[in-house]
């Protein structure tokens, strides 16, 4: 027969209920906050930024980053599709070649958009129009196309 010491005694299966203490008025300095749950009369409003703030945050984020902006798989599909348009035979591409091509393409696009933005600012606008991009390409010349 096993011995039962005070450390190995079983606890009762159900916890015992204690009666609540006599209700006392809460102290004057402390107020309790009650949460009524999801069916509350005034749900918390979602924080909204002012117009343009989110765009400026996004601009700062992408100016700090050095990674690629386009996804690799769609860019590689585009490169393969363009290669099929210009040659009948199937071309194989190394991963490093695709990455180098993507780096060059993104650098070209960033420079083109910054030049087009300067054209829009010169025209006293902040919105880019296709004519700004066309003017930027025309000013750059043939060797930069």
Swiss-Prot record:
A matching Pfam family: Histone
Lineage: superkingdom: Eukaryota
GO terms under cellular component: chromosome, centromeric region; nucleosome; nucleus
Chain positions with Phosphoserine modification: 19
Single GO MF annotation: protein heterodimerization activity
Region (H3-like): 51-145
Keywords: Centromere, Chromosome, DNA-binding, Nucleosome core, Nucleus, Phosphoprotein
Basic residues: compositionally biased ranges: 1-19
InterPro entries found in the cross-reference section: Histone-fold, Histone_H2A/H2B/H3, Histone_H3/CENP-A
Compartment(s) of residence: Nucleus; Chromosome, Centromere
Disordered, as annotated region: 1-54
PROSITE patterns, per the entry: HISTONE_H3_2
Main location: nucleus
Assembly behavior: Component of centromeric nucleosomes, where DNA is wrapped around a histone octamer core. The octamer contains two molecules each of H2A, H2B, CENPA and H4 assembled in one CENPA-H4 heterotetramer and two H2A-H2B heterodimers. CENPA modulates the DNA-binding characteristics of nucleosomes so that protruding DNA ends have higher flexibility than in nucleosomes containing conventional histone H3.
Family as reported in the entry's similarity comment: Belongs to the histone H3 family.
Function: Histone H3-like nucleosomal protein that is specifically found in centromeric nucleosomes. Replaces conventional H3 in the nucleosome core of centromeric chromatin that serves as an assembly site for the inner kinetochore. The presence of CENPA subtly modifies the nucleosome structure and the way DNA is wrapped around the nucleosome and gives rise to protruding DNA ends that are less well-ordered and rigid compared to nucleosomes containing histone H3. May serve as an epigenetic mark that propagates centromere identity through replication and cell division.
Protein name: Histone H3-like centromeric protein A
Organism lineage: Eukaryota, Metazoa, Chordata, Craniata, Vertebrata
Gene of this entry: cenpa
């Amino acid at each position: 027969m096993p011995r039962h010491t005070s450390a190995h005694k079983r606890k009762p299966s159900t916890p015992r209920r204690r009666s609540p203490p006599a209700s006392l008025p809460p102290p004057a300095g402390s107020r309790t906050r009650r949460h009524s749950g999801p069916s509350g009369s005034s749900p918390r409003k979602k924080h909204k930024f002012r117009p343009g703030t989110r765009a400026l945050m996004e601009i700062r984020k992408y100016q700090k980053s050095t990674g690629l902006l386009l996804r690799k798989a769609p860019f590689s599909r585009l490169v393969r599709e363009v290669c099929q348009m210009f040659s009948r035979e199937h071309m194989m591409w190394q991963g490093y070649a695709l990455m180098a091509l993507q780096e060059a393409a993104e650098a070209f696009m960033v420079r083109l958009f910054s030049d087009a933005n300067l054209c829009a600012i010169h025209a006293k606008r902040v919105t880019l129009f296709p004519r700004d991009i066309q003017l930027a390409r025309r000013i750059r010349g043939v060797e930069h196309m």
